Curated annotation (Swiss-Prot):
It comes from Histophilus somni (strain 2336) (Haemophilus somnus). One of its GO terms (molecular function) is rRNA binding. Gene3D superfamilies: 2.30.30.30. InterPro entries: KOW, Rib_uL2_dom2, Ribosomal_uL24, Ribosomal_uL24_CS, Ribosomal_uL24_KOW, Translation_prot_SH3-like_sf. Pfam families: KOW (PF00467), ribosomal_L24 (PF17136). One of two assembly initiator proteins, it binds directly to the 5'-end of the 23S rRNA, where it nucleates assembly of the 50S subunit. Part of the 50S ribosomal subunit. This is Large ribosomal subunit protein uL24. The gene is rplX.
Length: 103
């Protein structure tokens, strides 16, 4: 099945500590999780690796969010929207369900 949320889509977070935040999808994992730019930031404790010249300490990085907790952002309506699929000129295209605009 084709993915409704893809890399470089602008999404809005629907649930969790970052609810309401918007960002761009940087990575989509096959297990149904996505990485969103600037959202779901965690602090990792990393050990130093002298062989690679890496210093240890606290590192802030993005964690994955389940795809069910994000929705694609429709710039014309300024709201979260649902995605549909249809065939146009022999190609499968995605469209916003609220205004039938192709993504």
């Amino acid at each position: 099945m084709a993915a409704k949320i893809r890399q470089n889509d602008e999404v809005i977070v629907l649930a969790g500590k970052d609810k309401g935040k918007r960002g761009k999808v940087t990575k989509v994992l096959p297990n149904g999780k996505v990485f969103v730019e600037g959202v779901n930031i965690i602090t990792k404790h990393e050990k130093p690796v002298p062989a690679l010249g890496k210093a240890g300490g606290l590192v802030k990085k993005e964690a994955a969010i389940d795809v069910s907790n994000v929705a694609i952002f429709n710039p014309t309506t300024n709201k979260a929207d649902r995605v549909g699929f249809r065939i146009e000129d022999g190609k499968k295209v995605r469209f916003f369900k609220s205004n039938n605009e192709i993504i």
